[in-house]
Swiss-Prot record:
Signal peptide: none annotated. Zn(2+) 1 binds at C60, C62, C75, C78. This is DNA-directed RNA polymerase subunit beta'. The lineage of its organism: Bacteria, Pseudomonadati, Spirochaetota, Spirochaetia, Spirochaetales. The keyword Cell membrane does not apply. One of its GO terms (cellular component) is DNA-directed RNA polymerase complex. Binds 1 Mg(2+) ion per subunit. Binds 2 Zn(2+) ions per subunit. It comes from Treponema pallidum (strain Nichols). Belongs to the RNA polymerase beta' chain family. One of its GO terms (biological process) is DNA-templated transcription. One of its GO terms (molecular function) is magnesium ion binding. DNA-dependent RNA polymerase catalyzes the transcription of DNA into RNA using the four ribonucleoside triphosphates as substrates. Zn(2+) 2 binds at C781, C855, C862, C865.
Length: 1416
């Protein structure tokens, strides 16, 4: 017989009245629940035993039949079947309604499904259903139209006029008739025709109507089933009534709602029998409709029906939705048995894989195991006695407990479980007391500390569960962070301080030499006797260095002796970063078990020597640099100078503010550097505060700055920086105004933390919901697409090297050495650490790789596109739930980011603006391109953006007279190739591979060409083919203003600059100067303020459009030289770079929201020109090289980034503002959008120092791009504007093409994560996410089938999840022995034989004793 729980898919449909009656075991006719005297259910009431089953096990209501042997008998007296009381959880009843009523979900939920089918507005539909208006069902040959609404008077007039020539009705009955009369096939044909006519102009409503009609046609549901004539009554044990202590009853709200329905229904039947007046019956029908509405969805009704305690009653819909609903509360999150929780304390004596479990807890958790063991060992004869023994806590129990607990893992969990390392398995060690002991190194993955945190313990029961704990979940197998593959288990705080102190080296006095020792033992004796210090430099022969003499310290020898012998000699000062690198090196190059042993050794040494060091803090350790006073005076002078420039009218208010902030930021930074140097010199580098910060044990440079430097600039709650800095530090103490400014930041930190934690949690939830069904499910999808990877740079600084980005992925194309063309990587080759480094060393610029974004697996992803499983440092296995890991990896730091603000105490962390272009390495300039003006001093002033092309110089060689060069200019040169012969016969070889450039008497070896942007207004001081040493200024500019410069000599002429309409003149009260500012606020006037430069005869040489807030710097008619500043635009005022901007930004990107002030992007590449105004917006035209023009509308208030005659690329911004991802998709396509999103999201996290691997972000972005929008239907079944899954779209197109038809065309769609999660194939998963009613309504109409492919839907229905060993492909695995015999069958045979033998033995023993045993 097939198991009811064994099914592969689940379908939801509308129930017809007959189906509802078929479910039912009887009709509920009375509103009574239970009898107040006997407390037994009333007959035909809401708890009736005849309908729903007996309340007493194997007994009928009247007690005539009492026993399991009457199972299935129906009592002739009371009519109750003798059965188990659990049937009261599954048997349903029904209520026959006196008049049909509408189901609230189908007419009230937006968009109204009934309204769409009948083409009626919700208001009209409502007025019919609530008996306010009549609707024409059949107009006959009258002037009335079908579906026309009539008021009472209009209906009466029509009756008089036409008599019985037409049919009209009101209420659900009328709507039912209309729905019954619908011909769906004709309707859909008519609607599709309408769609074809309208084409692109068709509205969303039409698309929705077609979709709904199609759904009804395909699913086999009938539209009239949305009207109910019979209501199901859910089983009584799902709406229980419980007696409280005081004899009162608590009941489920559903009983009240059902009672109202039954009351009104009975009253309506009575009124109809009495032939009451129409108006009364109509009112009663309306009330019945309202009662049924409230039963199904009380929250939608306004006002909601309230109960006795004046709170709205919980209807069936409310039971399902929300955090406390059935889905999230009971199906996705269940309380589990065999669990406990307690406070955690640190357990430094434990091994990494152990945890301390209180004996009291273990006794309760392992109770059944102990009882079984007691019976097995024959300490007691049966389970009952064993239970008593355990409850008495007798000594025998404890001896058994040790055996039971030994090698039985437990799982520890700390809420919130933000990523998979929030639950790990440990081997329990029994401890005294009531607190769980936790190994200090696993605090990081759990994010636990010991300030009162609690943790939960769970016991895995089955053999398979225990096996999983040992092999997969044990803490020593989870050393790497799944988000980025770095180690997550590493020493911190005290341990780091101890290790740093132990391995630090004291500098020797001048002229002194390190003492020599012959062996480690000798060094240890000398150190213990105090002859040398632990940090003194010594020379010793050491076995890890093949007995060679090494210069080291006694402390480092201690460390090397304690760690496992296989680990190479560590001879450096260990701070937190180096410790982490050391662990990673051992883990990746040697062995994970070795890394575990080393971690435990490092923990022990760290604690020992932190105690030994005995770090203390005193006021004298906080040293304020002596130069602080002079530095503050210098800064004050600079601020005064800026103020006087402002008063003189040379700079604007915004520039003044920006420059003041810049001065203080710089001063604060310089003071911090000086302070750190002072601390480093103090006590020969053993200043406690300095050690704590540099070792990374506690505190940061920023915090020490506040203690001993100056607190610096603070931020207002809005994020603006207060230009008045706090000059004092905490040692000197703050004055009143400084203290007052500080309070802002401190409060904001706390408020932010509280608010943002919830946001981060919600972000994780949405991410999990969109990615939960992505599982690795095949080896290779066979795609030919991929993405090009390069190193991530910020300016010249490499943030993430190419090796770091490509490691752990598969190649898409061959990778060759750029100079020798030697094959480095083949197609579809896995890139491990060695290969990645080899590629980087070869100087490869970019590699094309396979990525999750381009994976073509229909469901989930394939191994080759995913690559490495970061948590295990191995290639991912089939069955890995990568979607959930990706969601957790992005969501988990989100929560960390929110907590970040308040540690600094609100001090502003603004980045200092650069005002020059310099390079940290020597370069050779190739060319400088862009519009510029030659200045008198020979420099070039750029009047628009330009580009500098250059090569990085790798080596240079000076040629002497007579040297013969052996390479050509610009030729490719390999390492060790001959460059030139000198006059004295020597040969000079190339030290590196590169390109040769011969300029004058120098040979340069340079790298590939690079380029950097030159800002508008920059003064470039170098020329083409010039060699620029590192640090030399290439160009200077003003970072705070965006100038518009004259490009020719000539005279200034104003156009459309009219005082009072486009020009405002203001007298600045602080400076007394007149400031002239452009404004475009007065709309309606078609004016475009601009400045012309003309020659003497008035011919225009150049024109400049002026944006809002531009400051005029020249008078009309003035003569100007090329390069004069005509107009200045202030750059935006500085804000602090804080993650509070980060989390909403991540949310905005993942939700695919259009930014508030999105920039207008150029739709094609071409030349810009301006063509007047349209509705108060500028028309910017871009003409491509075929002469085709594309118009763009730009608001007058926006600052233009292009000028007349500029060349732009497609997708380039025409005005200021953020990029809109939807525009990027439309203009540049899917790949560009993917790159933009990946970079933006990564940058937000990178600012906070959080690294997330691309594959995680890529997985989520891929899910957001799953759908496409149909733009041309062809011969397919699609509708214009329909949103279809990519794979379904391609499948349908293949089908049509095979039949020789015209395929459909679609454009890619970019959906936010919430929308994408709701549009997922699985209705169970979508319903458990959000908008439960809406999802279920749509699914029921469409007769949706859930194939149970995701994780969530399987958890909900209680199946194994289709990931890991639960994948369907692994469920049919059978084991065979060498002779191909089924091992399962053999095992069953062995067990059967054993049982028979045991039974025979038991009988023999019983026969010998002559009587059966006692209670066993």
């Amino acid at each position: 017989m097939k198991d009811i729980r064994d099914f592969d898919s689940l379908q939801i449909k509308l129930a017809s009245p007959d189906t509802i009656r078929a479910w039912s075991y009887g009709e509920v006719k009375k509103p009574e629940t239970i009898n107040y005297r006997t407390l037994r259910p009333e007959r035909e009431g809401l708890f009736c035993e005849r309908i729903f089953g007996t309340t007493k096990e194997w007994e009928c209501f009247c007690g005539k039949f009492k026993s399991i042997r009457y199972r299935g008998v129906i009592c002739d007296r009371c009519g109750v079947e003798v059965t188990h009381f659990k049937v009261r959880r599954e048997r349903m009843g029904h209520i026959e309604l006196a008049t049909p009523v509408s189901h609230i979900w189908y007419y009230r939920c937006v968009p109204s499904r009934m309204g769409l089918l009948l083409d009626l507005q919700v208001i009209a539909l409502r007025s019919v259903l609530y008996y306010e208006k009549y609707i024409v069902i059949e107009p006959g040959d009258t002037d009335l139209k079908k579906n026309q609404l009539l008021t009472e008077t209009e209906y009466n007039d029509a009756q008089e006029r036409y008599g019985g020539g037409f049919t009209a009705g009101m209420g659900a009955e009328a709507i039912r008739t209309l729905l019954q009369n619908l011909d769906l096939d004709a309707l859909v044909a008519q609607l599709r025709e309408k769609m074809m006519e309208k084409g692109a102009k068709s509205d969303k409503r039409l698309l929705r109507r077609i979709e709904i009609v199609e759904n009804f046609r395909v699913s086999g549901n009938k539209p009239e089933w949305m009207i109910l004539s019979v209501i199901p009554v859910i089983p009584p044990d799902l709406r229980p009534m419980v007696q409280l202590d005081g004899g009162r009853f608590a009941t489920s709200d559903l009983n009240d709602l059902y009672r109202r329905v039954i009351h009104r229904n009975s009253r309506l039947i009575r009124l109809m029998e009495l032939k009451a007046p129409d108006i009364i019956i109509r009112n009663e029908k309306r009330m019945l409709q309202e009662a049924v509405d409230a039963l199904f969805d009380n929250s939608k009704r306004k006002p909601a029906i309230k109960g006795a305690s004046n709170r709205p009653l919980k209807s069936i819909s409310d039971m399902l939705k929300g955090k406390q609903g059935r889905f999230r509360q009971n199906l996705l999150g269940k309380r589990v048995d065999y669990s406990g929780r307690s406070v955690i304390v640190v357990g430094p004596e434990l091994k990494l894989w152990q945890c301390g479990l209180p004996t009291k807890m273990a006794l309760e958790l392992f109770k059944p195991f102990i009882m079984k063991k007691l019976v097995e060992k024959e300490i007691v004869s049966n389970i009952k006695k064993a239970k008593m023994l355990v409850e008495q806590e007798s000594p025998k129990v404890f001896s058994v407990l040790d055996e039971v607990v030994k090698e039985h893992p437990v799982m520890l969990n700390r809420a919130p479980t933000l990523h998979r390392l929030g639950i790990q398995a440990f081997e329990p060690v029994l401890v005294e007391g009531k607190a769980i002991r936790l190994h200090p190194l696993v605090c990081k993955p759990f994010n636990a500390d010991f300030d009162g945190d609690q943790m939960a313990v769970h016991v895995p029961l089955t053999q398979a569960a225990q096996m999983e704990c040992w092999t997969l979940m044990l803490s020593n197998r989870n050393l790497l962070d799944p988000a980025n593959g770095r180690t997550i288990v590493y020493p911190s705080q005290d341990m780091v301080l101890g290790l740093y102190y132990l391995t630090k080296e004291r500098s020797l006095p001048e002229g002194a030499r390190p003492r020599r020792f012959s062996s480690v033992e000798e060094v240890m004796m000398a150190a213990e006797k105090g002859v040398i210090g632990w940090q003194d430099q010594i020379q010793v022969r050491y076995h890890k260095c093949d007995g060679q003499l090494v210069v080291t310290t006694a402390g480092r020898l201690v460390l090397n002796e304690e760690v496992p012998a296989e680990i190479p000699f560590v001879n450096e000062t260990l701070d937190d970063k180096r410790i982490r690198k050391l662990i990673e090196r051992v883990f990746k190059r040697q062995d994970s078990w070795l890394a575990v042993q080393m971690l435990d050794a490092l923990k022990t040494i760290g604690y020992t020597y932190a105690t030994f060091f005995g770090a203390t803090l005193s006021m004298d350790d906080i040293i304020v640099p002596e130069q602080k006073v002079q530095m503050l005076e210098k800064a004050n002078k600079e601020v005064l100078a800026i103020a006087s420039q402002y008063r003189g009218g040379h700079i604007t208010q915004e520039e003044r503010y920006n420059r003041v902030v810049e001065v203080w930021s710089k001063t604060s930074e310089e003071l911090t550097s000086l302070m750190m140097e002072t601390l480093e010199r103090d006590k020969d580098g053993f200043n406690t505060i300095y050690m704590m910060a540099t070792s990374g044990a506690r505190g940061s440079r920023n915090q020490i700055r506040q203690l001993a430097g100056m607190r610096g600039l603070m931020a207002k709650p809005s994020g603006d920086i207060i230009e008045l800095p706090i000059r004092s530090n905490f040692k000197e103490g703050l004055n009143v105004i400084e203290f007052f400014i500080s309070t802002n930041g401190a409060r904001k930190g706390l408020a932010d933390t509280a608010l943002k934690t919830a946001d981060a949690g919600y972000l994780t939830r949405r991410l999990v919901d969109i990615a939960q069904d992505v599982v690795v499910n095949e080896e290779d999808c066979g795609t030919i697409n991929g993405i090009e990877y390069r190193a991530v740079k910020s300016g010249d600084e490499i943030i993430e090297s190419l090796a770091e980005r490509i490691v752990g992925k598969y190649t898409l194309e061959r990778v060759e050495h750029p100079i020798t063309h030697e094959l480095l990587l083949d197609v579809n080759e896995y890139i491990d650490d060695e290969r990645a480094e080899k590629v980087e060393e070869a100087g490869v610029e970019s590699v094309k790789l396979r990525t999750v974004l381009t994976c073509e697996s229909k469901r989930g992803v394939c191994v080759c596109c995913y690559g490495r499983n970061l948590a295990r440092n191995k290639i991912v296995e089939i069955g890995e739930a990568v979607g959930i890991v990706a969601a957790q990896s992005i969501g988990q730091p989100g929560t960390q980011l929110t907590m970040r603000t308040f540690h600094v105490g609100g001090t502003a962390s603004s980045t200092t603006e650069e005002n020059r272009i310099t390079f940290k390495y020597p370069i050779l300039v190739k060319s400088i391109e862009g519009v510029h003006v030659k200045m008198e001093d020979g420099s070039q002033l750029f009047t628009r953006r330009g580009t500098l092309f250059f090569h990085k110089t790798l080596a240079e060689y000076q040629l002497q007279e007579g040297d013969s060069v052996q390479v050509r200019d610009r030729a490719r040169v390999l390492k060790d190739e001959v460059l030139y012969h000198t006059t004295d016969g020597q040969t000079v070889y190339a030290s590196v591979s590169g390109f040769a450039r011969i300029i004058d008497r120098t040979v340069y070896l340079v790298g590939p060409e690079q380029k950097t942007e030159i800002r508008n207004g920059s003064n470039v001081v170098i020329k083409a083919d010039e060699y620029v040493p590192p640090g030399k200024t290439v160009a200077t500019f003003d970072p705070f203003t965006e100038p518009i410069l004259a490009e020719q000599d000539g005279f200034v002429r104003y156009e459309d600059i009219i005082l009072g309409s486009t020009l405002i003149e203001e007298v600045n009260t602080e400076t007394g100067m007149v400031e002239r500012r452009i404004t475009t606020l007065k709309t309606g006037i078609q004016l475009q303020p601009r400045v012309f430069i003309s020659d003497e005869s008035g011919n225009a040489l150049g024109s400049y459009y002026l944006p809002e807030e531009a400051r005029l710097m020249v008078e009309e008619g003035a003569q100007v030289k090329a390069g004069t500043v005509i107009v200045k635009l202030a750059k935006a005022i500085q804000k602090t770079s804080d993650i509070t901007g980060g989390l909403p930004r991540v949310s905005e990107l993942f939700e695919a929201r259009r930014p508030k002030n999105a920039a207008v992007l150029a739709q094609i590449s071409g030349v810009v020109s301006f063509k007047g105004l349209f509705k108060g917006k500028r028309i910017v035209v871009v003409r491509d090289h075929y002469g085709k023009e594309y118009k763009h509308l730009v608001s007058m208030s926006r600052q233009l980034l292009v000028r007349d005659g500029d060349t732009v690329e497609a997708g380039e911004r025409l005005c200021d503002g953020c990029f809109d991802p939807h525009d990027i998709l439309a203009i540049l396509g899917e790949n560009a959008l993917q790159n933009y999103l990946m970079n933006e999201i990564r940058d937000v996290y990178r600012v906070q120092g959080v690294s997330i691997n691309d594959q995680h972000i890529g997985l989520v972005v891929r899910q957001m791009l799953r759908k496409t929008e149909v733009v041309s239907v062809g011969d397919t079944r699609f509708i214009y504007g329909q949103q279809v899954d990519k794979y379904r779209f391609h499948e349908e197109n293949r089908r049509v093409e095979a039949e020789g038809g015209q395929p459909a065309v679609a454009r890619p769609m970019f959906q936010g994560i919430t929308k994408a999660a709701l549009n997922i194939d699985s209705f169970i998963s979508a319903a458990s996410f959000q908008e439960t009613n809406k999802v279920l309504t749509n699914a029921a109409i469409a007769g949706s089938v859930d194939d149970l492919c995701g994780l969530k839907e399987n958890v909900i229905i209680g199946h194994l999840i289709p990931a890991g060993t639960g994948m369907r492909r692994y469920r049919q695995v059978k084991l065979f022995d060498k002779n191909k015999r089924d091992l399962d069958v053999q095992m069953e045979e062995v067990i059967r034989r054993r049982k028979l033998e045991e039974e025979a033995l038991a009988q023999a023993v019983a026969g010998m004793e002559g009587e059966p045993e006692g209670e066993a």
